[in-house]
């Protein structure tokens, strides 16, 4: 009896060990994360502050803030010290929240179509989607993702109607750092977070 149980468990472990671990594709990953966001936005029982907090958590799951920041700064990333980078990451995230938070919360049940994956380079893919507005207009909304060391697909750029979030901010940061210092850039971001004009 005991011998049979041991053999059975051994076979089970062998089968489990031989089974391939399922990894979600980039499109599946984006669809799952976007649907989580939509679930929050459609929840009429949640107040705005509660929605913002839940969206903040989902943002951390969906995006890689350091990779996004690196791409937005481009070569200028190397101009920042480790301490400046550690301050830049949360500051920039707060700037993004202030800039796009209200727009996301204004979502009014538009339909989202998940179309295809387009390879960019090794380990990087663009997931192409379309937002169908209430006026029957199609808005291209693409997510650029990369596969991190743990094998998870994370967003590092969003392209809406051919306008890249990364390139938009890189242009702004290049202009600031061409004449100023990393500390001056951080001060500009601090003021943006506080809602002050720069």
Predicted regions and their residues:
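Bacterial N-terminal signal peptides that target proteins for export
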Residues: 1-9
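Surface-exposed, charged secondary-structure patches
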Residues: 98-139, 187, 192-198
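A mature extracytoplasmic/lumenal domain signature
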Residues: 92, 116-119, 130-133, 145-147, ...
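Low-complexity, intrinsically disordered terminal/linker segments enriched in charged
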Residues: 157-198
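Sec/Tat signal peptide C-region and signal peptidase I cleavage site
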Residues: 17-23
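Short beta-strand edge/turn micro-motifs at domain boundaries
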Residues: 140-167
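Early exported N-terminus immediately downstream of N-terminal targeting peptides
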Residues: 25-100
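Bacterial N-terminal signal peptides
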Residues: 8-17
